[in-house]
Structure formats: structure tokens, C-alpha cells
């Protein structure tokens, strides 16, 4: 098979506007090309989004010329292959229309042999205005959805969040966003390859099914090889063949074992000539979701190689509103940062797009389980015959593209639609409710049965199994829990719920000052300014951050301190939830934080901001997602929902340590504890011997401190392994930090080689090392009982360093 790439230099025109034609790059997009040509300002700066949005009321034309030789035209089939057209497009070659597209999530192929000729040819791809299209389509066929997005967004198969979301701007870009090429096929080609695995008696039987597109009656044959990580090779032949792998090296999620990958190659040959080749890496593993009746209801947990895994991870959204900016290097850093925070699971949220192949390749390498939503979110759809045909082709394209990946843990029908459709949200007819059932409980399962029969399918998130059967049932399936944040309940409310698997819960914070400065002018730097609220898409959420801040901290004297306090709020909210659910391992088997990343600079739920900068939450995640975690369920003012005006009160003050072990080995060690004063001097101290079986959690004896002060004592704890090495530590207060009688810890910090050395003379809570926004450290936002702590510089260069703690929030 010969390929003539059409990637590279094109020209972009915007008919009917004063814009002159500009050079364009494919893969690319309208915004990306206009920015490169300096024809529009940065849409992420201040409120430039509004002008950029108006631009999308236009149509757009991409064109170029290209050379074709006789060898390319000699093929038995010559196709134009477009792997991503965003979205409503018509394609002309040499002035003749060859095809139309209506779905950015699909691969489009058009027969072009009859319109090509030797020498110079021209291609034009015309895109309709996405904003006008959804307006016209909505007028003809009402399909409603989230009010954070533009009206009509469900009427187009385009990443929903491009039209706005409660964390993203309204920037519905357009263009040729993935590879485009001419392919010339001799005799036949490989259409797709499916690999099924049967694990039995210490061997893995690989069943390899190859589908061909044949264009002649000539004899062809298929050769298959599997190369193991050690270089050994197994071979077979035929469109349906089997290989038996002896002593297989199994693929495991991060934290449970290695991620060995086998190279599977399928070649199509005729008369000694290779016509086509399909080559991918696969991992040998079993993968499903355990659903068993138990004392709490019905379990829900990823089961890999027979082991039930506690999912520790985050929800992934598109990395950029300008899709051409997403590349393997950027995605690798983001996913490596997820793994660095001890995550083992990533949920690909259903309101964006199906990520590029490299996303899944990296997850395979890192051991990150992928919960894969189909691209439907917070909307209803009208299932016409044309729409059904369109989405079915979308499902087939993407299932075939992704199914071989070791990291693919499950397919999920949609985001949050079962619960909202069940409530009648967005539904304007009973037909739409019936269409919901047909789409997610008939069409998708039918496609998966044919294309990925070994995969686990879940109809929606959240769901209890489908058919509108109590989608948020806490005793089965997965839940999205938002009463903390959207419901304004306190952090401690998480402890009232055990759940089986929490696939969304979150809390917002502001990004760091350097990120805020990237999208604001000096006069904008107030959290209630127009620009700051334009970069806060969750309605009045800046005020919500301050509402929660009022419960926990003194009012900060500067925006910089407010940003710091907001990040602590976010981190501590998630800590309350995750630590609680890990303490109840077995009942709860998943804590997936909303969200991992941002698509533009914004105040949001992300733990890593648009520029890849770690917030406090990401450092906290590194601790509370640790394979072996020591945590403390404290009782005090916050947990008992009281306040200072209830004094004098009978207040329980206690500490109850727990060690959770998400490893395959028994853990033995020692838990050391101490009750201390604000200057970190010890009032009482002691220790517990700790033994925790693999894949379990153990409570240590509860300790009562009701006779000690509420505002001037704190509890500190540390876990050591048998060799005396520190495994984890922390501290808890018996009151809100705003009322604790902190003493100045007299923090100091300096750089020594690749370390930052922090010293404290007293209790320092949530110590933040400021060493540059792009610097990543081995630890940050940690507690100190006085003394000295050395922190490694993992990424970036440090010119100067400063340090602060909760004592400084005033």
C-alpha cells in the first residue's frame, strides 16, 4: 500500500470577510493558523474569547495542490483518507466533490481514483460555520443539554466542550485536525485486526482475527508474528489464527506489577510482496469489572488478572481548546505526572473527543487504567436514521482503533445522561427517552459484541447498571458525588457516604499567580473582576471558594495568599474524601477525582493547570494515593458540625488512625503518634505496631483527647516500615485552622545541590515551597513538627526559594 501524505502546508481562506488568505498547517485548525499568522489575538487572554467566538460564524476553506505519479494511480483502489475533519465539511479534488463529512470523531475515506490525474492536483476542504450549523439544526430538531454550553451543541458530532462547559470557553474551532492522505491499494488491505485472549493454566492463547478489504480475486495471505519483551518470536498465518504464549509476562496497573508489552505484527502478502502491515503493542492480561453481591449491596471494581484493584485517579478532559497544541510530549508529561501522584486510573470524560493513539500508548506504558466514555455528555439526542448511522460508524471506528490497548479498562456509554434523562432534564419528548435506551443499551452493546466482545461495558456514568434504575444508588455501580462543592456541604460530609466507586467528586481552586498573570492585566487581578469571572465558568464559583474559605481560614490580605488558601481548600476537601474511602476498602473500590487537567488557564477543579503546573492538590494526591497510606479520622469541631458560639460544649476530640495497603504484599511497620502544642513540643506520644494484609485496610485503636485543649493542641502521626523508613505522615487539628492558635514557625528555606532544605522552629501546617511555578518537587504543602526537611528538585531550575504556611494566611 502506497501513501501520499497531504499533511503540511495548506492555505486557509475565510470567504466573505476582510481576512486575507493565510498559510495553514495540517493537521491544524482555524484558530491555530490565524494565531500563527498573527491575525487574531490570543483567545485565552482577558476576554478575547468573545471575538474569537464571533469568528466561528464564518465558513472556512482549506486548499492546496499536490503531485500524483503513475505509481500511485496504478492501485486497484485509491482513497482519500481523512482521520479527522472538524466538522461539517465538503471535500473537492480538482473541482469535483468526492465526499462530505459530519462527525469529527470519525475516519472518513472517499474513492478518488477517477478524479486524480498524473502531475499536479488540487484539494479543497470547505467547513461550514459550526455556530450557524447548530443554530439551524436546533431550529429544526430540538436537542437540549448543559446550559454551560451553547444552545444546539447536541446537534453536531463535535467535542461538546468546544461550545463551552463549566470549566471551558466557547471556542468551537474548525479544521483538518488529524492526518490526511491519499492511499493506493494493490489487490487488498488490512481493514482491522482484533485480538482475543484466553488465559488458562499459566498460558495465554491469542486468537487473532484479521479482516481484509479485497479489490481483486488474486490470492493473498496473512502472516502473524508476536515478539515478546525478551525478543522471542511466535508466528502463525491466516486471517483467523492462534498463538500460545508460554510463561506469559502479564501486564499490570501501576503499583501492582510491570507493564511488559508484546509487539503484534500482521502482514498481508501476495506473490512474495508485502501489500500492507498492521503493527501494535499489546499487553497480556484479563480485564473486567467485578460485580458481586455482598453485605453492602453489589461490588464495583476493576479486576485485572483476577485481582480487584482500588482505582485511584482523575478525570481527563481535552488538554487544550486548540487541539493542534496537543502532542505526544505534552500528553506524556501530563500522564507521567498523574502516575507520579500514584494514580493508577484515568477516566476519559465523554464531552470531549477520543484521544490520539499516543495517549493510550502512554497509558499502556505507565500502567494507567483507562475508563473510556463514548463521546456523549449532559444532553439528549434525536435518534434519526441518519444520526444512528453516523454514530454507529463512529463507534466502530474508535472501538477498532483502541480495543487492542492493554490499558483499556472499560467502555462507558455517556457522562451523566442516565441520571438526568431519568429526572426529565432536557427531555422534550418520550421519544428522546426511548432513544436514550436504544443508543446506550442496544446500539453500543451491539457494536461491542461484534468488535470488542471481551470488553466490559457500562451504560453510563453514574449508573447502577442501566434502564434508569436509580443511577446514583450508593450501594452499587458508580456515583458522581457533588454535595460537597455544588451542594455547599462541608468537607466532612464525605465521611457520611461509603459508595462503591466514586467516578466524580471535586473542589475548585485558583491556579497559581503566574498562570493568573498569563490571562489578566494588572487591573483584572481581583477574584470578582470581569476577566477573573470570565475565567471561572462555574457560574458564581469564585464566591463559592470564598464561602468555603470562610469556614476554614482567616481572610487573606492579598490575592497571592487567597490563591494559596484556595489550593489548600481544594486539596483538603479531596483528602477528606479519598482517605475516608480508602479506609473502607472493600466497600468502596474507586476514588477518581474531578479533574486532572485544564484546557485553558482558568479557576477549576484541576490538580494540574493549563500550563502543567502542579497545584497543592496534586502533591496531596501523591500522598493520599500512596500504595500504603496512613490516615486519621479525627473528631472535633468540624466533624461534629458545631461552632465557637456553641461554647461551652461537650466536644469529642479523638484520633483514629488507619493504614490502607493497596499492594500485593503484607505490610508490617510502626505507627508513631504525638499530641503537640503549637510550638511542636510534645504533650503525649506513643506508637502502634502495624500489620496490614495485602489489599486491605486496618484500623488502629481510637484515642480520646477530650480533656485537652481544642485550639492549642494538634495530633501528629507517622508510619514507618520494618526498616524504619518513613512511609507517610500527617497531622490533624480539632478545630478549623482559622481558630487554631498557631505560633510563628519561623520557616526558612535554602537550596543545597538538588535539594531544598526547609527548617521550622514550631508547627508548620501545609508548608508551601515557592521555587518557581514550573518547578516540580518531591513534596510540597506538607506539615512539619519543627525540625528540618529536605525536598528533592525533580523538574525545573530553582533560582530563589521562599516558604510559607497556614500561619501566614491572615
Describe the residue ranges of each PLM region.
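Secreted/periplasmic carbohydrate-active enzymes, especially glycoside hydrolases
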Residues: 1-345, 475, 583-584, 613, ...
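Substrate-binding clefts and catalytic carboxylate motifs of secreted carbohydrate-active enzymes
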Residues: 14-15, 172-175, 411, 446-449, ...
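Flexible loop/turn segments at secondary-structure boundaries
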Residues: 87-89, 132-134, 290, 318-321, ...
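Active-site mouth of glycoside hydrolases
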Residues: 105-106, 126, 160, 170, ...
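Flexible loop residues that form catalytic
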Residues: 128, 185, 351, 416, ...
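Glycine- and acidic
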Residues: 249, 342-346, 555-563
Amino acid at each position: 500500500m502506497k501513501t501520499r501524505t497531504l499533511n503540511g502546508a495548506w492555505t486557509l481562506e475565510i470567504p466573505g470577510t476582510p481576512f486575507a488568505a493565510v498559510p495553514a498547517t495540517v493537521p491544524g485548525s482555524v484558530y491555530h493558523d490565524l494565531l500563527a499568522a498573527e491575525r487574531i489575538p490570543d483567545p485565552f487572554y482577558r476576554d478575547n474569547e468573545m471575538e474569537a467566538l464571533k469568528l466561528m460564524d464564518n465558513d472556512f476553506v482549506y486548499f492546496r495542490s499536490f503531485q500524483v505519479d503513475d505509481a500511485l494511480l496504478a492501485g486497484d483502489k485509491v482513497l482519500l483518507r481523512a482521520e479527522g475533519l472538524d466538522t461539517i465539511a465538503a471535500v473537492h479534488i480538482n473541482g469535483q466533490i468526492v465526499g462530505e463529512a459530519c462527525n469529527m470523531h470519525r475516519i472518513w475515506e472517499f474513492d478518488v481514483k477517477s478524479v486524480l490525474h498524473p502531475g499536479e492536483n488540487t484539494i479543497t476542504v470547505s467547513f461550514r460555520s459550526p455556530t450557524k450549523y447548530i443554530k439551524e439544526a436546533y431550529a429544526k430538531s430540538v436537542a437540549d443539554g448543559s446550559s454551560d454550553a451553547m444552545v444546539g451543541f447536541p446537534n453536531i458530532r463535535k467535542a461538546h466542550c468546544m461550545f463551552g462547559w463549566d470549566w471551558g470557553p466557547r471556542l468551537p474551532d474548525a479544521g483538518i485536525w488529524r492526518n490526511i492522505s491519499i492511499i493506493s491499494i494493490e489487490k487488498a488491505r488490512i481493514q482491522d485486526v482484533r485480538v482475543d485472549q484466553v488465559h488458562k493454566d499459566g498460558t495465554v492463547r491469542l486468537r487473532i482475527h484479521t479482516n481484509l478489504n479485497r479489490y481483486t480475486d488474486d490470492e493473498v495471505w496473512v502472516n502473524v508474528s508476536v515478539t515478546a519483551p525478551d525478543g522471542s518470536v511466535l508466528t502463525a498465518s491466516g486471517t483467523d489464527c492462534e498463538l500460545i504464549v508460554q510463561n506469559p509476562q502479564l501486564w499490570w496497573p501501576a503499583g501492582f506489577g510491570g507493564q511488559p508489552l508484546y509487539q503484534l505484527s500482521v502482514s498481508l502478502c501476495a506473490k512474495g510482496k508485502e501489500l500492507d502491515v498492521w503493527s501494535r503493542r499489546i499487553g497480556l492480561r484479563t480485564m473486567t469489572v467485578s460485580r458481586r453481591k455482598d453485605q453492602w449491596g453489589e461490588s464495583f471494581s476493576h479486576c485485572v488478572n483476577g485481582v480487584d484493584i482500588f482505582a485511584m485517579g482523575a478525570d481527563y478532559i481535552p488538554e487544550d481548546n486548540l487541539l493542534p497544541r496537543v502532542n505526544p510530549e505534552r500528553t506524556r508529561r501530563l500522564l507521567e505526572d498523574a502516575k507520579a501522584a500514584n494514580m493508577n486510573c484515568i477516566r476519559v470524560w465523554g464531552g470531549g473527543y477520543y484521544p490520539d493513539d499516543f495517549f493510550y500508548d502512554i497509558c499502556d506504558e505507565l500502567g494507567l487504567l483507562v475508563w473510556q466514555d463514548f463521546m456523549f455528555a449532559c444532553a439528549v439526542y434525536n435518534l434519526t436514521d441518519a444520526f444512528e448511522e453516523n454514530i454507529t460508524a463512529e463507534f466502530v471506528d474508535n472501538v477498532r482503533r483502541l480495543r487492542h490497548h492493554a490499558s483499556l479498562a472499560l467502555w462507558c456509554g455517556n457522562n451523566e445522561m442516565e441520571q438526568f434523562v431519568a429526572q426529565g432534564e432536557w427531555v422534550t419528548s418520550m421519544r428522546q427517552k426511548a432513544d436514550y435506551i436504544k443508543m446506550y443499551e442496544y446500539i453500543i452493546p451491539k457494536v461491542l459484541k461484534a468488535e470488542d466482545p471481551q470488553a466490559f461495558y457500562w451504560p453510563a456514568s453514574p449508573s447502577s447498571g442501566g434502564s434508569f434504575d436509580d443511577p446514583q444508588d450508593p450501594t452499587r455501580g458508580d456515583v458522581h458525588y457533588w454535595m460537597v462543592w455544588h451542594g455547599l456541604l462541608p468537607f466532612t460530609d464525605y465521611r457520611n457516604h461509603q459508595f462503591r466507586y466514586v467516578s466524580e467528586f471535586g473542589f475548585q481552586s485558583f491556579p497559581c499567580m503566574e498562570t493568573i498573570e498569563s490571562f489578566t492585566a494588572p487591573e483584572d487581578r481581583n477574584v470578582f473582576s470581569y476577566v477573573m469571572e470570565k475565567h471561572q465558568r462555574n457560574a458564581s464559583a469564585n464566591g463559592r471558594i470564598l464561602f468555603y474559605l470562610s469556614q476554614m481560614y482567616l481572610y487573606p490580605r492579598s490575592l497571592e495568599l487567597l490563591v494559596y488558601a484556595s489550593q489548600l481548600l481544594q486539596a483538603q476537601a479531596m483528602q477528606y474524601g479519598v482517605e475516608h474511602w480508602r479506609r473502607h476498602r472493600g466497600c468502596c473500590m474507586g476514588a477518581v477525582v474531578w479533574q486532572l487537567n485544564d484546557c485553558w488557564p482558568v479557576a477549576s477543579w484541576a490538580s494540574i493547570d493549563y500550563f502543567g503546573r502542579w497545584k497543592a492538590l496534586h502533591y496531596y494526591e501523591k500522598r493520599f494515593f500512596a500504595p500504603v497510606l496512613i490516615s486519621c479520622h479525627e473528631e472535633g469541631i468540624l466533624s461534629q458540625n458545631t461552632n465557637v458560639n456553641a461554647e461551652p460544649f461537650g466536644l469529642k476530640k479523638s484520633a483514629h488512625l488507619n493504614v490502607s495497603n493497596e499492594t500485593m504484599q503484607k505490610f508490617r511497620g510502626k505507627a508513631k503518634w504525638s499530641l503537640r502544642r503549637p510550638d511542636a513540643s510534645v504533650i503525649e506520644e506513643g506508637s502502634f505496631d502495624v500489620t496490614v494484609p495485602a489489599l486491605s485496610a486496618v484500623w488502629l485503636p481510637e484515642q480520646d483527647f477530650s480533656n485537652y485543649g481544642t485550639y492549642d493542641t494538634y495530633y501528629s502521626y507517622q508510619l514507618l516500615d520494618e526498616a524504619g523508613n518513613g512511609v507517610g505522615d500527617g497531622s490533624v487539628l480539632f478545630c478549623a485552622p482559622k481558630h487554631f492558635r498557631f505560633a510563628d514557625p519561623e520557616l526558612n528555606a535554602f537550596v543545597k545541590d538538588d535539594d531544598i532544605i526547609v527548617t521550622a522552629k514550631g508547627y508548620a501546617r501545609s508548608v508551601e515551597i515557592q521555587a518557581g511555578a514550573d518547578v516540580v518537587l518531591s513534596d510540597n504543602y506538607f506539615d512539619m513538627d519543627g525540625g528540618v526537611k529536605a525536598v528533592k528538585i525533580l523538574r525545573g531550575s530553582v533560582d530563589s526559594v521562599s516558604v510559607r504556611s497556614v500561619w501566614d494566611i491572615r
